[in-house]
Structures are given as C-alpha cells and as structure tokens.
C-alpha cells in the first residue's frame, strides 16, 4: 500500500523504547480531557502502571480485525482499522468508512488496506507494524515480526493483477505487504494476541511468546483454514479465542470474498466440546477471574460491531 498521511504527526514514538515508568501499585484512572490532546498521556507517564496487575479489560469489536481494548486505568488501544482499497486491484470490501474515534494508541499488524487505515481514527500514538516493545501506563505491546500467509495463485486461476503478482512475492522474497507483525497486548493481567493475517507456521523462535496467552484473536476462514486454526489453538493453548477477519452483515460486502466463521464456531461446540459464548453486543469485558479455569473458550461477536 502507498504511504499515508498520519493524523498523529509529531506524536510518534521510538518503537524499541519503553515509554513511561512502571508503578508497582497504580490504580489511577486516566481522566478524560475536554480537548483532544496528549494531556492524558502526560498524566499516565507520571503515574505509570503495571500491565500484569489484574483488572477489567474492555474489548469492543469494530469489525474485521479492528478491536478497541481499554485498560483498567482507561488507556485505549485500537488494532487494525480498515478501509477500502484505493488501487483498483480489489473490489469494495466495506460498506462504510472506519469511524473517526478517539483512542490513545493505534497499532497495525501489516500493510494491507483492510488493516492499515491508521489515519482514520484520531490516535495520539500510532504504531504501524510494531516490532519490539512499547509500554505506556498499564499497557505493554510486543510486536513479533513474521510473515503474512501466502499461497501463490496459478496464472490460469488469477482474477486480478494482484493475484498474478502474488506468484513471485511469497516469503522470503515478499513485498512489504506480506510482512506481518503479531501484536501481543498485555493489560489487566491478561495477554491478548492479535494474529493479523500471519501464516499458520510461524518462525519457531516466536513460539515462547505465544504459549499460554490468555486470549488469541484469529482470522478464521478468510485467512486461516479451520485445520490451521485448530492446530494453532492446540499448540498455544489460550484460555479464550476470539474469531476475527470474517464477514459481518451490515459492514462487509459480498464481493469481498470474506467468509463467515459460523461453521467453525459450531464445530467447536459439537466436535471439540468447547464452550462457545455468542455475544449479544459488540462489547465484552474480561478479567483474570472470568478466564480462570477456561480452556479455549470462544467469544464470538457475530455481526455485532461498533459504529462510532
């Protein structure tokens, strides 16, 4: 994708630096500001925070792979805001534009249009394809560099110029759009891994980061196959799984080719005897108590998504 103007000019951070002091016992909430600026970030820089300290973590689904995560002290992280392709290589995927919501941190996994609209939300800190560690208050984000899933399209099956180009760009000689950085967000004593569109068999050196994550957000059906998803869940053994990157009624177009994970979700309940919670809104609150003793519990937002 081409370069974009970012809404947070002047507020970038060095991705490999730790930002903000760690307070051993900080329960201070971030006070909302009537003016949208970095006052709240300055405040939390002073008070610090501990990502490992248990507390309520709010997760709101904005469709596709976009989730707004609110920490116990009130800091917000938005993952992978989406847009429609501007090159003409792909049909329209989304029926609307991503809402211009205010968040403290925006982070993306890779440079594809359905994940990289970092200029749409009003973010104070923008972390495009973060690799390394970033800390602010009671949030710590770790980006793991790996590769996007890639399956070359045979020339006789290609339907777009992008399909033809893909044949010669799969890793390791890939274009930047097929780099992917899994993002692990730690807050409230929970570790939440945003897979992005990463390949199923990632570099073995990264395995220890993902083993026993609390929540694993996986692109089911439209990127990873059900067999690949099951293998990933078995390998890393999360307490909970949240499907992402799927067809959402009222948001995703039929021409996108993005599919529903319903079959996989149903199979988990019947064939794997997993606990499935079909959510009745786009809003979920998790904490260490809620997930205690949980084993691969599925939280499925379905077609509920936030619009503003």
Where are the model-predicted features located?
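Active-site neighborhood of phospho(di)ester-bond hydrolases with catalytic His/Asp-centered motifs
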Residues: 78-82, 102-118, 143-144, 193-196, ...
């Amino acid at each position: 994708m081409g370069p974009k103007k970012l809404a947070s000019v002047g507020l970038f951070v060095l991705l490999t630096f730790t930002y903000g002091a760690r307070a051993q016992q900080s329960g201070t909430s971030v006070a909302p500001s009537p003016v949208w600026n970095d006052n709240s970030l300055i405040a939390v820089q002073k008070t610090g925070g501990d990502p490992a300290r248990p507390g309520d973590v709010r997760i709101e689904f904005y469709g596709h792979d976009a989730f707004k995560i609110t920490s116990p002290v009130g800091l917000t992280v938005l993952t992978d805001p989406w847009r429609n392709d501007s090159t003409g290589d792909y049909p329209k995927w989304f029926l609307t534009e991503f809402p211009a919501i205010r968040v403290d941190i925006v982070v993306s996994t890779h440079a594809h249009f359905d994940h990289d609209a970092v200029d749409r939300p009003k973010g104070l800190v923008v972390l495009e394809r973060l690799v390394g560690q970033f800390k602010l208050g009671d949030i710590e984000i770790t980006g793991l560099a790996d590769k996007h899933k890639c399956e070359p399209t045979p020339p006789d099956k290609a339907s777009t110029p992008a399909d033809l180009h893909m044949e010669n760009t799969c890793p390791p000689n890939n274009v930047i759009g097929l780099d992917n950085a899994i993002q692990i967000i730690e807050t409230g004593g929970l570790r939440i891994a945003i897979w992005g569109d990463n390949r199923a068999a990632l570099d073995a050196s990264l395995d220890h980061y993902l083993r026993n994550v609390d929540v694993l957000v996986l692109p089911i059906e439209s990127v990873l196959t059900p067999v690949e998803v099951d293998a990933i869940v078995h390998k890393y053994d999360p307490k909970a799984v949240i499907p992402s990157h799927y067809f959402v009624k009222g948001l995703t177009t039929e021409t996108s080719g993005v599919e529903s994970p319903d079959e996989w979700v149903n199979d988990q309940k019947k064939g794997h005897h997993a606990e499935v919670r079909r959510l009745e809104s786009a809003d979920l609150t998790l904490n260490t108590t809620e997930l205690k003793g949980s084993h691969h519990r599925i939280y499925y937002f379905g077609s509920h998504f936030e619009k503003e």
